[in-house]
Regions:
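Intrinsic-disorder-associated, low-complexity terminal segments enriched in Asp/Asn/His/Tyr and depleted
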Residues: 12, 28-29, 33-34
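Catalytic/RNA-binding core of pseudouridine synthases
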Residues: 18, 39-284
Length: 284
């Protein structure tokens, strides 16, 4: 009975927090005219017109090869074109590498103030990892620089090793990353051939699951906290297996409650936004 009361109290507090946070990521509604265009319930404000200056939150499925900056620029261009304005504040809530695909949250206008909030939501990834070889960037951006034995690796060993990466872990970010080193981006220094030393960061891996094991390739599902580099996780898994590893594919399938199926391909954004009713703003 005591446990039941405690659980009820926790659930009550949680529900209150969700309510006072404006439903946050839990409640969202599908926009008209496109099955993959999703917006927060708080965005409707009693109507269906979109007000990008006041603030809208858009969900995109970033294509392979696109930078996060390109997704933001593409959205900004077509929004400004429709609104007939020269500028609009637009930003994203979490970078994806060019070789990764998946969920990107893009905020406009006053909604950009919520970017930090969105960044702290849990993220889910599907990662394909090649064992037995490494690259300087821990992915396919660079050529293989070393090979390692894999004959000793079995499915059972992989499953046991993955268990070591759940909970709080220390992770050293990749040298080819946006981390700052003495006021400069780490990737700028790394591309110049300079040695980059980055300090380990405390992260949380909520879940890690082996989906496929076709050695020397494995596919895993990872649920993790803000700041986790899946490329670095692949590196660490390889080392823990007394081998090497690098990432060959990565898809971000969820951010908070926003799933990949809720997202719009940026290539479809022009057609979608041309079918929407917008609040037209002056003086931007």
């Amino acid at each position: 009975i005591s446990c039941a009361k405690t659980m009820a109290s926790v659930l009550h507090q949680l529900c209150n927090e969700i309510w006072f946070q404006g439903i946050r990521m839990v409640s969202y509604h599908r926009r008209r005219n496109h099955p993959s265009a999703v917006a927060y319930g708080t965005q409707f404000r009693g109507g269906v017109m979109m007000d990008f200056k006041e603030g809208e939150v858009l969900y995109f499925n970033k294509p392979l090869g696109w930078t996060s900056f390109k997704v933001v620029g593409h959205a900004r261009y077509h929004i400004c074109r429709r609104m007939k304005v020269k500028k609009l504040k637009v930003g994203h809530a979490g970078t994806l590498d060019p070789l990764a695909t998946g969920v990107m949250i893009v905020c406009t206008g006053k909604a950009t103030k919520r970017i930090e909030e969105f960044q702290y939501h849990t993220k889910e990834y599907i990662a394909t990892i090649r064992l037995g070889a490494t690259t300087p960037s821990y992915d396919l951006e660079h050529e293989i620089d070393a090979t390692y034995p894999t004959e000793h690796i079995t499915r059972e060993l992989v499953e046991e090793t993955l268990k070591k990466f759940t909970g709080e872990i220390q992770q050293v970010p990749p040298a080819f990353s946006a981390c700052m080193v003495n006021g400069k981006r780490a990737y700028d220094l790394a591309r110049k051939g300079e040695e980059v030393e980055l300090k380990p960061k405390l992260l949380v891996i909520d879940e890690i699951e082996l989906l496929e094991c076709n050695l020397p390739e494995i596919k895993v599902r990872v649920v993790c906290s803000k700041g986790t580099y899946i490329r670095a996780l692949a590196r660490d898994i390889g080392e823990a297996l007394h081998s090497g590893a690098h990432l060959t594919a990565l898809e971000r399938t969820r951010v908070g409650d926003v799933r990949i199926e809720d997202c719009l391909n940026p290539l479809d954004f022009k057609e979608w936004i041309d079918g929407q009713d917008l609040v037209m703003s002056d003086g931007l």
